[in-house]
Amino acid sequence: MPNPTVKTITDVGIDLDGVMYPFVDAFREYCSIHMPDGKFPEPQQWNFYRDWGIEDDTFHRWLYEGAQSHNLFSTHYPMQGSYLAWELLRKLKVRIHVMTARPTTAWKQTADWLHHHYLVPDNLYFTSKKSMLAHVATGTAMAIEDHVDYYEDLKGAGVLTVLYNQPWNIAHPNSPRVSNLVEFAQLVEQINNREIPCLQTALVSSTQPQNL
């Protein structure tokens, strides 16, 4: 009988904000325009802006306005490891799908930013239904996320999924974790080289919990 663990990763899904793009830093800079005396501590929860004294409605309004007036989604460089990871994934000949739930005001900026930094994916999806990766993949898919809801959604769809270690997901139990995109690409390489079984449980045992 064929061994179900002997598979090759053909497609990867990569989140943007908090994985490739330092959105919190960009939004902090924008908030300082409106709140010059504000305090902006490092995020400890997904809705980090609440710790900055910003209401939900204000956050969404500034998200819209900042994208139009200050290129909120394209002002910063890619996060550590993005370039090296991209190079390794291309060498592995996997299809790269960038998947983000960014608002419509960010769509053009996002595409331009990826091209400007030579991080051009095979596909770019703007969606909150990231489990679609399971349906567009040509074979076995693997993904990286920093939002626990998307992580669970992907995992539930049968996608091998890794959490990008962030304060807002640190308490999520039994989750494989990486500290940068290079580590994710190396996991893909190890699976495709048959060094790690192609199983979610194997990913958990192959990555160590990281304290922030």
Stretches with model-predicted labels:
Residues 133-138, 184-199:
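Short amphipathic alpha-helix with an adjacent loop that forms part of the alpha/beta core around
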Residues 2-61, 172:
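Active-site neighborhood of HAD-like aspartate-dependent phosphohydrolases
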Residues 124-128, 176-183:
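Short acidic-hydrophobic, aromatic-tinged amphipathic segments that line or gate anion-handling sites
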Residues 101-155:
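Substrate-recognition "cap/lid" segment bordering the active-site pocket of phosphatases
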Residues 142-179:
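Acidic, Mg2+-coordinating phosphoryl-transfer loop and its flanking beta/alpha structural elements
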Residues 68-98, 104-109:
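Short, acidic loop-to-helix structural element flanking the phosphoryl-transfer center
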